[in-house]
């Protein structure tokens, strides 16, 4: 990965900076973005030196912003570390179908829905269609390159993206995005007290 070309386009770097500041609110994190051939879906990995890998897909600026936000939120939630732990547990319990097959796919869906929920607060409601389009572009790219590349990002993405029920659930949730006003949050908090 250290030999891979880094993103050099000013436009992409500006989109990345805007997405980064919306997620982390500070410049203390060092996250590299690498666009490369050979992967089918965007992916974020690494706990101490996180990296975002982007496939060779032409996204619009807003779609790219949504993709980068999505991956940065995965990094913020430390989803990659959770997946590694889940993979380890699956290896230990390889004989148990619930743990080795069902639990990882459920965890993947929960992580994706949690990221979608987190994005609701950042992405303007009018851009939810761009977010959904970026998911569809990624799915089309992953399915068209399915036979050529079966890397780990493809495996996780195809398990999650090819499941129509999961996609329907995500798109339904994205369609229902509504920005919550701070006053509503305050009222809810006051009601709890």
Where are these regions (language model features)?
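Membrane-embedded and juxtamembrane structural elements of multi-pass membrane proteins
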Residues: 1-193
């Amino acid at each position: 990965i250290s030999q891979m070309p880094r993103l050099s386009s000013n436009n992409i770097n500006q989109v990345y900076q805007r997405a980064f500041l919306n997620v982390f609110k500070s410049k203390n994190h060092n996250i590299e973005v690498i666009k490369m051939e050979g992967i089918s879906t965007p992916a974020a990995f690494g706990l101490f030196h996180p990296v975002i890998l982007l496939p060779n897909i032409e996204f619009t600026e807003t779609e790219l912003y949504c993709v980068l936000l999505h991956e940065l939120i995965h990094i913020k939630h430390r989803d990659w570390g959770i997946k590694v732990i889940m993979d380890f547990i699956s290896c230990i319990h390889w004989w148990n179908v619930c743990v080795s097959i069902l639990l990882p796919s459920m965890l993947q869906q929960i992580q994706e829905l949690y990221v979608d929920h987190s994005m609701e607060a950042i992405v303007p409601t009018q851009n939810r269609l761009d977010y959904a389009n970026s998911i569809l572009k990624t799915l089309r790219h992953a399915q068209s390159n399915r036979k050529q590349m079966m890397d780990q990002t493809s495996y996780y993405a195809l398990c999650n993206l090819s499941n129509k029920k999961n996609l329907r659930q995500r798109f339904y949730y994205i369609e229902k995005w509504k920005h919550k006003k701070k006053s509503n949050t305050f009222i809810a908090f006051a009601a709890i007290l």
